[in-house]
Regions:
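A conserved helix-loop-strand patch within extracytoplasmic ligand-binding domains
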Residues: 1-20
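Paired acidic/hydrophobic, glycine-rich loop segments that form the ligand-binding mouth/hinge
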Residues: 127-129
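Hydrophobic alpha-helical
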Residues: 37-38, 53-119
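Short beta-strand elements in bilobed, periplasmic/extracellular small-molecule ligand-binding domains
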Residues: 18-21, 42-58
């Protein structure tokens, strides 16, 4: 939904345009599920959007950069890219920059690292979807103790996610998610 809002804010009509998903590992069920969920939501929001074939890059940022740059150059109507982890996020941010497509191709990545954070600040990467690794670990330990002490634990826990963009990257709550050790 955030990407659609970004397109509208930039005056980009996504109808009939192209979109790309970069998959970090064909062997990872988590990444497969993440990508499938993302693509299904995009198709629900913009049914006429054309999904390019998912690109599998085996968690290689250099390969991701090259694939991103090549596909941007070959598809002038490509308006969005989703990278399903931080290494592919590094690659798409460098590929978008190398293709001179910052601000034209909206790039979102899952997870965050220093290169991606800088790319968001520089306006090359539109945003990142980040979790709360400290909170996830804390809750995991808490539920493990509860289970060992025969207390009831939830069957499922929504650990949440935050969309980080240039507009909120300096927010103290977002800073805590990006730099949990500080």
């Amino acid at each position: 939904d955030a990407m659609l809002a970004d397109w509208k804010a930039a005056g980009i009509d996504p109808q009939g345009k192209k979109f790309l998903v970069i998959n970090s590992s064909k062997a990872s069920k988590v990444d497969q599920d993440r990508d499938r969920g993302f693509m299904e939501r995009m198709k629900a929001l913009v049914p006429s959007m054309v999904m390019l074939d998912v690109q599998y890059v085996e968690n290689d940022p250099v390969l991701t950069e090259n694939v991103t740059k090549t596909l941007i150059q070959a598809n002038p109507d490509l308006i969005g890219i989703f990278a399903d982890n931080d290494m592919t996020g590094v690659g798409i941010s460098k590929g978008i920059a190398a293709a001179g497509a910052a601000g034209k191709v909206m790039g979102y990545a899952f997870d965050a690292n220093d290169v991606e954070i800088q790319a968001v600040k520089d306006g090359v990467l539109t945003g990142m979807v980040v979790q709360d690794p400290f909170g996830i670990g804390y809750k995991s330990a808490m539920f493990a103790v509860d289970a060992l002490e025969n207390r009831q634990v939830p069957k499922a826990v929504d650990t949440g996610a935050t969309i980080v963009t240039k507009a909120n990257i300096d927010d103290p709550k977002v800073h805590k998610l990006l730099y949990p050790n500080q």
